[in-house]
């Protein structure tokens, strides 16, 4: 992704803070946004039904007990594909 693009995703994941040095040069410093700002953005773009599905999905993902890395990747990919397919149907 190019730096010049101005998308909601880049706005929500990083905040550009421009500071002036003593010599007058401008430098950009990337800061992490606050978690509440990210959550507000997420709540605005998600419907209540979509948010509920996402919460259920992550609770199931977090409940996995020490799976091997390969099986974890397989289960997550299957779940994610199923979740995305259901989103398109609904």
From Swiss-Prot:
<feature type="region of interest" description="Mitochondrial targeting sequence">
    <location>
        <begin position="65"/>
        <end position="87"/>
    </location>
</feature>
<feature type="site" description="Low pathogenicity">
    <location>
        <position position="66"/>
    </location>
</feature>
<dbReference type="InterPro" id="IPR021045">
    <property type="entry name" value="Flu_proapoptotic_PB1-F2"/>
</dbReference>
<keyword id="KW-0899">Viral immunoevasion</keyword>
<keyword id="KW-1045">Host mitochondrion</keyword>
<keyword id="KW-1119">Modulation of host cell apoptosis by virus</keyword>
<keyword id="KW-0945">Host-virus interaction</keyword>
<keyword id="KW-1090">Inhibition of host innate immune response by virus</keyword>
<feature type="region of interest" description="Disordered">
    <location>
        <begin position="1"/>
        <end position="34"/>
    </location>
</feature>
<keyword id="KW-0472">Membrane</keyword>
<keyword id="KW-1048">Host nucleus</keyword>
<dbReference type="GO" id="GO:0052150">
    <property type="term" value="P:symbiont-mediated perturbation of host apoptosis"/>
</dbReference>
<dbReference type="GO" id="GO:0039545">
    <property type="term" value="P:symbiont-mediated suppression of host cytoplasmic pattern recognition receptor signaling pathway via inhibition of MAVS activity"/>
</dbReference>
<keyword id="KW-1113">Inhibition of host RLR pathway by virus</keyword>
<dbReference type="GO" id="GO:0044192">
    <property type="term" value="C:host cell mitochondrial inner membrane"/>
</dbReference>
<protein>
    <recommendedName>
        <fullName>Protein PB1-F2</fullName>
    </recommendedName>
</protein>
<dbReference type="GO" id="GO:0044164">
    <property type="term" value="C:host cell cytosol"/>
</dbReference>
<feature type="compositionally biased region" description="Polar residues">
    <location>
        <begin position="1"/>
        <end position="28"/>
    </location>
</feature>
<keyword id="KW-1043">Host membrane</keyword>
<keyword id="KW-1097">Inhibition of host MAVS by virus</keyword>
<comment type="similarity">
    <text>Belongs to the influenza viruses PB1-F2 family.</text>
</comment>
<dbReference type="Pfam" id="PF11986">
    <property type="entry name" value="PB1-F2"/>
</dbReference>
<comment type="function">
    <text>Plays an important role in promoting lung pathology in both primary viral infection and secondary bacterial infection. Promotes alteration of mitochondrial morphology, dissipation of mitochondrial membrane potential, and cell death. Alternatively, inhibits the production of interferon in the infected cell at the level of host mitochondrial antiviral signaling MAVS. Its level of expression differs greatly depending on which cell type is infected, in a manner that is independent of the levels of expression of other viral proteins. Monocytic cells are more affected than epithelial cells.</text>
</comment>
<keyword id="KW-0053">Apoptosis</keyword>
<keyword id="KW-1046">Host mitochondrion inner membrane</keyword>
<keyword id="KW-1035">Host cytoplasm</keyword>
<comment type="subunit">
    <text>Oligomer. Interacts with human SLC25A6/ANT3 and VDAC1. Interacts with host MAVS.</text>
</comment>
<dbReference type="GO" id="GO:0016020">
    <property type="term" value="C:membrane"/>
</dbReference>
<dbReference type="GO" id="GO:0042025">
    <property type="term" value="C:host cell nucleus"/>
</dbReference>
């Amino acid at each position: 992704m190019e730096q010049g693009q101005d998308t909601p995703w880049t706005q929500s994941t990083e905040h550009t803070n421009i500071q002036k040095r003593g010599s007058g040069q401008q430098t950009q410093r990337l800061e992490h946004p606050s978690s509440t700002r990210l959550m507000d953005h997420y709540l605005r773009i998600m419907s209540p039904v979509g948010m509920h599905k996402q919460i259920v999905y992550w609770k199931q993902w977090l409940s996995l007990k020490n799976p091997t890395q390969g099986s974890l990747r397989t289960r997550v990919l299957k779940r994610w594909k199923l979740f995305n397919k259901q989103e398109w149907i609904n």
